[in-house]
Structure formats: C-alpha cells, structure tokens
C-alpha cells in the first residue's frame, strides 16, 4: 500500500497507461480459467506498482514476500471467484493511481491484500476443523474396534 501511495506521485501517465494495458491484457487469463498464467501476471502487476514507486527498499523487500506468496496465490486463484475479484480490484487500484488519489490507492491495495489474507485464514481454519473432525471419527472407530476385540 505504501508503494501505491508513492506511485501516485512518482509514476508518469505513460507508466500508468502501461500498467492498465498490462492488467487488461492479463485479465483475459482470469476469465478463461488460465489461472496459472493469471497468477503469474498478478504477481507482476504488484511488482510493477512497486517499480512505479521508485523506492528500491520497498521493491526488494516486497519482492521477497511476493515470491513466498506465489504458491499460495496460485492456489487461491482457483478457488471461488478469487481471480475475477482480483481483476476488479486491480482495475480499481489503477483508477485510483490514475486519479493520483494516494489515500484511495493505498487503501485499495491494503484491502486487496487483506482479502487474500482472509481467504487463506478461512481455508486454514476449515482445514484444521476438518482434521479435528477426522481425528474424532478415527478415535470413535478405534474405540469400536477395541470394544469388539473384548
């Protein structure tokens, strides 16, 4: 969100037009279910905003995080409407950048990122609940076996 905030000041109109063209070109991948391609483009979109900020420290720090998140993002894109929601988010972010609204751009990036966080947290919670449920079923089955053996 800091990079988007800075990019509203630092990015040229031509830079923002290039970002929009990139996002539009890659939004097709999301709609055609070419999700691995879209996931890669999604990472590149965020890297482009980091580059537009002109802040090398932000860019290098975030690049490491983006690469760690790559696998998570790729998997999440295939679930529910994550890809189409991501495309819509990107367009809103671009509009905020183009209008040079630093606060809005920053907020939209933060909300976009937190939606992925919330999605992952929800999936993790459901997986943990599923594991607990499986353990209860296995425990109950083991008890039945013990009773039958007696």
Listing of model-derived features with the role each one plays in the protein:
Residues 1-11, 41-80, 116-120:
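Hydrophobic, amphipathic alpha-helical faces that serve as interaction scaffolds
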Residues 2-32, 37:
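Amphipathic alpha-helical dimerization/coiled-coil segments
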Residues 16-20, 39, 59, 106-107:
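Conserved positions within tetratricopeptide repeat
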Residues 20-27, 32, 44, 67, ...:
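C-terminal all-alpha effector/ligand-binding and dimerization domain
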Residues 36-40, 60, 84-88:
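Amphipathic alpha-helical packing segments from all-alpha helical-bundle domains
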């Amino acid at each position: 969100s800091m990079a988007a905030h800075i990019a509203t000041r630092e990015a040229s109109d031509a830079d923002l037009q290039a970002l929009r063209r990139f996002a539009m070109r890659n939004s097709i991948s999301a709609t055609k279910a070419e999700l691995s391609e879209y996931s890669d483009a999604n990472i590149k979109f965020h890297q482009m905003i980091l580059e537009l900020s002109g802040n090398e420290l932000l860019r290098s720090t975030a690049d490491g995080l983006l690469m760690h998140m790559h696998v998570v993002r790729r998997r999440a894109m295939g679930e529910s409407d994550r890809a189409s929601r991501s495309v819509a988010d990107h367009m809103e972010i671009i509009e905020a950048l183009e209008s040079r609204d630093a606060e809005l751009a920053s907020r939209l990036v933060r909300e976009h990122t937190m939606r992925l966080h919330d999605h992952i947290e929800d999936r993790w919670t459901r997986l943990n609940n599923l594991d607990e449920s499986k353990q209860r079923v296995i425990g109950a089955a083991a008890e039945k076996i013990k009773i039958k053996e007696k």
